[in-house]
């Protein structure tokens, strides 16, 4: 498998591109440490390779697995005007760089699986987490969840969850220690565990105390000079603003009275947003700003609002206050996603992260207007505009063969038209109002992920459980086969039962929706 690595020239190009364009997303791999490992790797002799993995230094056995994942991510996020020599990596006329990226990532996965049988290493955990990044980005979300579980278990085997921070303030030195990087990797593992647990309705396997997470660095160094923020600063800023509450939100189902903790978390997040450091605010000075920072902060804004969104979504049908707050968070998510999309290269449109937050937020916004047409009417003009922009974004992603965007678009377009018909019943769809393409509504129902929104958005909806649209899209769409092999785990708030009814509102036969007494009690 080592022979599948590209030439040194191509490796150098892609490694440079990775740390310039991609690494800031999660800050999983430290550049100085990685380059040191790469230099050591290149000093290995042919004889060492011939004698097999046991002849390699322990610290380098997992390195090629990580290298393959770095190359894969770099290829996946190449700009449209990429270096011409990268086309040499293609060996067929119809290949794209993303095809080669998938092959490299698969090779890295096979190597990581081979070395897991021996002693786990931090480099191996990084390789597994990078593989989960690739799977999530390319739409294999269920597979990413399984890979994440493997990485978490190996990290626990290494004791990464037991490492205490050396300082209450994050410090980026010229060379990151294994201890510091291990702690950083564990934080990302925890955040992914919490986020995917909420999105997929799965149990969490990690816990983390906010007291054990360092704060972002000051905007000035020890000499008082201005210093640019680092990717880790953005992640830590988002964590202490909102991400730290994800594990509490995941556990809300265990509480009899959820109103007090929900209100407390909401107010704390608002206070934290108001107290963001100057470099992280929308009103910040952009002079001398590193090129990655704008997209990183926009991603952070989306994720912070997602926490507010996730906090209130389970209660939108039972509590008007939560309904309005979830609606506001969804609108802010869509505005943030629009700004982020404007910064995204077309070649990155296959990245499924551009679908996740947009789809969930659009479904909730439309559902609230459909179910409660007399509420938030003053917001409807803005809602209509922002949904139309979201639909156009999904169409752009669909045109770049983003399969999940294709399924999401079919649902959202139908919800959009149902919303128009509900709020303004005098308007006819034949007039072409709404800004969407009428031809898209002639698609056969079997080509889309069905959703019985006509059934669930009825006047007696008060006791019906709240949807997890993205989870249902993954369960019912083209990823259903891979999901069917996944462990059957209960979803929070009984949302799997809710999802069973999401079949057929747009003309197909639907399954009957059965609600038990226990389910009704949980919903209330």
Report each predicted region and the residues it spans.
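Intrinsically disordered, low-complexity transcriptional activation domains
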Residues: 400, 429-524
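C-terminal transcriptional activation/regulatory domains of eukaryotic transcription factors
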Residues: 1-123, 131-140, 172-176, 222-229, ...
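Fungal transcription factor middle regulatory core
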Residues: 36-39, 79-80, 84-90, 155-287, ...
